[in-house]
């Protein structure tokens, strides 16, 4: 099979395996990366992004049809650089062994953090830079090499990444594989030392099956239907502003975007009014507004319109926030207005499938327990968002629901913090990265026990057994502390 792959050059399946072999060989022959080399890789990644940020923003926008330049610089470039700088600042401390108490006299116990080797990275299209270089911050800090497979849905960005990576890194440090889903399947079947995938749940199942053949450990960053749970104690204007800020950012094409809102039935009209007012102020027009991002491709554009048609057919009321009353459907630039959907029912597609767009279903409740029960009836989401000042209700969300993260009185801000792990649970993913959590994910925590020559750690195991072992066993098997 021929693929468009390694650093932009056509390669076959065997060449992909050979490239991985070269990276593994270099890792073994050159030994674990020391602090100086780790810092060098982090510095080169930072330089690559900063020195080429305008070209990257142009490529991303061309792939989307229109992608806000500021959103690319803020999230993809600045977000990546922040994670890389955090790793650069702390990696020396992270590398230090952890010393532990040894139970045997004369022994020393510690944990050393050893590089895994070569990590495979499969990154998505919605944030094609930060969801590649965010993981790489931990991968490089841990002393690994990496092979990156960016999304085929952003071909200009992926090709530019391949070109830049080849310029800033040796091919045995970081290399790029370009290609479609068939290439992605081949990539995920390689015997990496670890594989991280960011994307949808359905594809993640195939990734896990392929990785299992080589017993490759995986980190899966997925998505799901992240709920917004609004208390009666919440400020509805603040809720609407914070929720709609994220729901319209990148046109809602975010794994952590609010997927539906649960609010008290008497607050529905207030929320709709505040949301409409706020969105109109942010985006007085949509069609030619460079701040408002297009849907990535026709397939996803049609999918979102299918959700709207389905909701209307099943009794939903669709509230399109289109202040300039522009005709968007036939514009050719694939923009969909921010849209609220009320009178929703559980059989609607918008309440059963991850939306990944600027559509926001609103479901009302009478008592807070029913809101909790509704969240728990769904698969575990990547995040849950609670708004309100009622401490009892807040604790119910924290204790009675399970999600990758909980954010109180805000949306998505946790992902900006490298001091917190980023990851899902259940159908929203497994494993985590960011900061020290990424360093640990991409390291082998190797226990080391050093016994002194006079140590007695295994004397009790030596035959013949007599009074000494019986006395020891009586102590070890006692119920007393």
From Swiss-Prot:
The active site is at residues 221, 255. It is an enzyme of class 1 (oxidoreductase). InterPro entries: Ald_DH/histidinol_DH, Ald_DH_C, Ald_DH_CS_GLU, Ald_DH_N, Aldehyde_DH_dom, Aldehyde_DH_NAD(P). Pfam families: Aldedh (PF00171). Its EC number is 1.2.1.68. Keywords: NAD, Oxidoreductase. It catalyses: (E)-coniferaldehyde + NADP(+) + H2O = (E)-ferulate + NADPH + 2 H(+); (E)-coniferaldehyde + NAD(+) + H2O = (E)-ferulate + NADH + 2 H(+). GO terms for cellular component: cytoplasm. The keyword Ubl conjugation does not apply. GO terms for molecular function: aldehyde dehydrogenase (NAD+) activity; coniferyl-aldehyde dehydrogenase [NAD(P)+] activity. Coiled coil: none annotated. One of its GO terms (biological process) is aldehyde metabolic process. Belongs to the aldehyde dehydrogenase family. The enzyme activity with NADP(+) is 4.3% of that with NAD(+). Homodimer. Catalyzes the NAD(+)-dependent oxidation of coniferyl aldehyde to ferulic acid and which is induced during growth with eugenol as the carbon source. This is Coniferyl aldehyde dehydrogenase. It comes from Pseudomonas sp. (strain HR199 / DSM 7063).
């Amino acid at each position: 099979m021929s693929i468009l792959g390694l650093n932009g050059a056509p390669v076959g399946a065997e060449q992909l395996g050979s490239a991985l072999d070269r990276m593994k060989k270099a890792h073994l022959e050159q030994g674990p990366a020391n602090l100086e080399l780790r810092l060098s890789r982090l510095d080169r990644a930072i330089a690559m992004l900063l020195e080429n940020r305008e070209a990257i923003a142009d490529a991303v926008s061309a792939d989307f049809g229109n992608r806000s330049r500021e959103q690319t610089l803020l999230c993809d470039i600045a977000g990546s650089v922040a994670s890389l700088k955090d790793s650069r600042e702390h990696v020396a401390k992270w590398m230090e062994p952890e010393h532990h108490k040894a139970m045997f006299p004369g022994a020393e116990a510690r944990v050393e953090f050893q590089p895994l080797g070569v990590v495979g990275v499969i990154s998505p299209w919605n944030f094609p830079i930060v969801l590649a270089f965010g993981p790489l911050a931990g991968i490089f800090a841990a002393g690994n090499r990496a092979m990156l497979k960016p999304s085929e849905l952003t071909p200009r960005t992926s090709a530019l990444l391949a070109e830049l990576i080849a310029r800033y890194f040796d091919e045995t440090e970081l290399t790029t594989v370009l290609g479609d889903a068939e290439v992605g399947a081949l990539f995920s079947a390689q015997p990496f030392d670890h594989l991280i995938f960011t994307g949808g749940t359905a594809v993640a199942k195939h990734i896990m099956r392929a990785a299992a053949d080589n017993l490759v450990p995986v980190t899966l960053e997925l998505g799901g239907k992240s709920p917004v749970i609004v208390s009666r104690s919440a400020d509805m204007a603040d809720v609407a502003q914070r929720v709609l800020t994220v729901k319209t950012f990148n046109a809602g094409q975010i794994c952590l975007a609010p997927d539906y809102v649960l609010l008290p039935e008497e607050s529905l009209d207030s929320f709709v009014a505040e949301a409409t007012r706020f969105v109109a102020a942010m985006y007085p027009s949509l069609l030619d507004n460079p701040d408002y991002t297009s849907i990535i491709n026709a397939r996803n554009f049609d999918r979102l319109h299918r959700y709207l048609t389905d909701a209307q057919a099943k009794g939903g009321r669709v509230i399109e926030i289109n202040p300039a009353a522009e005709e968007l459907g036939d514009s050719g630039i694939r923009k969909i207005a921010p849209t609220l959907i009320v009178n929703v029912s559980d059989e609607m597609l918008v309440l059963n499938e991850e939306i990944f767009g600027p559509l926001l279903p609103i479901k009302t409740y009478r008592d807070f327990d029913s809101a909790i029960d509704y969240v728990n009836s769904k698969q575990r989401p990547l995040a849950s968002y609670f708004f309100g000042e009622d401490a009892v209700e807040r604790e119910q969300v924290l204790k009675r629901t399970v999600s990758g993260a909980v954010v109180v009185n805000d949306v998505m801000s946790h992902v900006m913090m490298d001091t917190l792990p980023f990851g899902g649970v259940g159908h929203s993913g497994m494993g985590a990265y960011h900061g020290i959590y990424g360093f640990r994910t991409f390291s082998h925590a190797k226990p080391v026990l050093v016994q002194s020559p006079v140590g007695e750690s295994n004397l009790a195991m030596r035959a013949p057994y007599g009074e000494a072992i019986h006395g020891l066993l009586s102590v070890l098997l006692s119920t007393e502390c």
